[in-house]
């Protein structure tokens, strides 16, 4: 049995992508979610799930969980529930305290409170170099294995010349704390790109992305698609010649599809991933973003698409190998057969 800590099943395709990968890599295991809310905890106790989870293995599925107070409390409870079971964290992200959003939960030296918890783990690897640096600051040396979503199947889809994907959504907060300005500037960029002959498709990673995406794409002929799952999202991103994205996993799945990315860096985790695939040129921080800068980056990405695809593709290949090796170790540790 695997006790799983993540954020899947709540409408975010990025978190669902990670869960899909972990389930595939650990196929044969029975998964039980670590409860998030009081009513879920009561249900786990009343139905005996807590009892059955005793001695199970705990897996942090990925996402930017480490360094956040909310997830530390969930992890505390999960470790207490499993008792002597093994713990594994593959490709996790670490909240950078340099950014203080409305719900970050990383203030008051929160990350140091994670050291004794993560020290108990059999395996810890992280999404990107900044996550590794943050853990090194609290005395934990870890390897960068990449984001688990990079282990989804790679698509075999030809990109459509001139098709630009746009994803406009984010979690609790962003650099600059001004989402309306972001909508305005991206909208200006979209209109300019259309005037230059490009076609636009809006790609939703969460239903909450719809309102801002519709407003940014207002006034132009554009489709908006909401993929039903992560694999479908990869396919939509693969059809594009380039994508302008804010959601972290829109950028990660685009990298998997080898589609050039312009990443609207709304939080440090976007830079963490971009550094991991040697693609910092893709980043525009949301507190300094302008329509002109977006258009310029799109033009540059299209002009240098072959180089970008080779560079990012090589990094993705390396991380797919590292992630597969990490999960093979987890499978061996918990007694699952080789796949």
Regions found by a protein language model. Give the residues of each.
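Active-site anion-handling motifs in enzyme catalytic cores
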Residues: 1-339
């Amino acid at each position: 049995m695997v006790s799983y800590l993540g954020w899947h099943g709540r409408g975010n395709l990025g978190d669902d992508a990670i869960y899909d990968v972990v389930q595939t890599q650990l196929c044969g295991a029975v998964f039980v979610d670590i409860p998030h809310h009081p009513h879920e905890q009561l249900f786990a106790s009343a139905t005996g799930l807590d009892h059955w989870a005793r001695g199970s293995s705990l897996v942090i599925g990925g996402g930017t969980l480490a360094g956040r107070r909310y997830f530390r409390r969930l992890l505390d409870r999960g470790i207490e529930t499993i008792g002597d079971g093994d713990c594994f964290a593959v490709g996790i992200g670490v909240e950078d305290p340099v950014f203080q959003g409305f719900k970050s939960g990383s203030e008051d030296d929160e990350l140091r409170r994670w050291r004794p918890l993560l020290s108990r783990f059999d395996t810890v690897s992280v999404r990107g170099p900044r996550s590794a640096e943050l853990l090194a600051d609290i005395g934990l040396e870890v390897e960068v294995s990449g984001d688990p979503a990079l282990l989804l199947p790679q698509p075999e889809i030809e990109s459509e010349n001139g098709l630009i994907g746009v994803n406009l959504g984010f979690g609790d907060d962003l650099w600059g704390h001004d989402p309306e300005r972001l909508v305005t500037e991206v909208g200006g960029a979209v209109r300019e790109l259309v005037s230059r002959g490009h076609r636009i498709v809006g790609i939703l990673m969460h239903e909450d992305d719809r309102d801002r995406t519709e407003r940014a794409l207002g006034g132009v002929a554009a489709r908006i698609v909401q993929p039903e799952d992560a694999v479908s999202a990869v396919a939509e991103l693969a059809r594009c010649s380039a994508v302008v994205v804010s959601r972290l996993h829109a950028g990660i799945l685009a990298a998997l599809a080898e589609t050039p990315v312009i990443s609207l860096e709304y939080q440090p985790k976007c830079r963490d991933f971009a550094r991991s695939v040697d693609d910092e040129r893709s980043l525009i921080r949301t507190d300094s973003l302008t329509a002109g800068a977006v258009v310029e980056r799109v033009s540059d990405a299209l002009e240098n698409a072959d180089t970008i695809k080779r560079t990012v593709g090589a990094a993705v290949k390396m991380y797919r190998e590292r992630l597969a090796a990490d999960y093979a170790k987890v499978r061996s540790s918990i007694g699952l057969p080789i796949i």
